[in-house]
């Protein structure tokens, strides 16, 4: 499923570049740490999102806070800590919507991503902010709308 990408903002928190080897190394170390600590970070349950790079075509894995949405679906927020730009994984999903996987509690599955808009987004946003108030702070840091994606188990082709 494809979606229209939310544009970048003009202001926001500074975000590290994922393009350099050091940042990718730190990302891999963080994933190992999170796995050992029960897939949690700062009080948030995590999932591991795997996408295919929009430019490189290589698989990329990113730990993200997960919010249950029923029927085995999860919500994730493309916040990048309130950066002016959308995270790389968001662009990867837009470029390769049929190549998205998650790992939750040791179970891996292929998913479809749906960007929420309008009332469904607002309802989801309120649930997310009630659960993790830090996301309201991320939104205040930037003038872009933080995309919320629903990741649902993919139907077999």
Predicted region positions:
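A generic structural motif
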Residues: 50-54, 103, 152
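Alpha-helical membrane-targeting segments
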Residues: 2-45, 140
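Short, active-site-adjacent segments that bind or coordinate small-molecule cofactors and metal centers
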Residues: 135-157
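Short beta-strand segments
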Residues: 44-79
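A broad, low-specificity signal marking well-ordered, structured residues that form hydrophobic/aromatic
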Residues: 47, 74, 100, 111, ...
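Short strand-connecting beta-turns/loops that link adjacent beta-strands
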Residues: 69-72, 107, 156
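Short, structured beta-strand-loop surface elements
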Residues: 80-134, 141-145
């Amino acid at each position: 499923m494809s979606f229209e990408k939310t544009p970048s903002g003009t202001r926001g928190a500074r975000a590290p570049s994922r393009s350099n080897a050091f940042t990718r190394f730190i990302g891999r170390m963080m994933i190992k740490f999170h796995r050992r600590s029960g897939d949690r970070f700062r009080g948030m349950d995590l999932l591991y999102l795997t996408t295919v790079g929009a430019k490189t075509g290589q698989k990329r894995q990113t730990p993200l806070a997960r919010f249950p949405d029923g029927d085995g679906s999860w919500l994730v927020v493309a916040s990048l800590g309130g950066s002016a730009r959308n995270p790389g994984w968001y662009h990867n999903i837009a470029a390769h919507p049929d190549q998205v996987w998650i790992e939750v509690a040791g179970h891996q599955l292929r998913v479809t991503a749906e960007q929420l808009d309008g009332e469904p987004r607002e309802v989801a946003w309120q649930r997310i902010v009630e659960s993790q108030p830090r996301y309201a702070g991320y939104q205040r840091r930037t003038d872009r709308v933080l995309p919320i994606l629903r990741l649902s188990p993919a139907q077999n082709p």
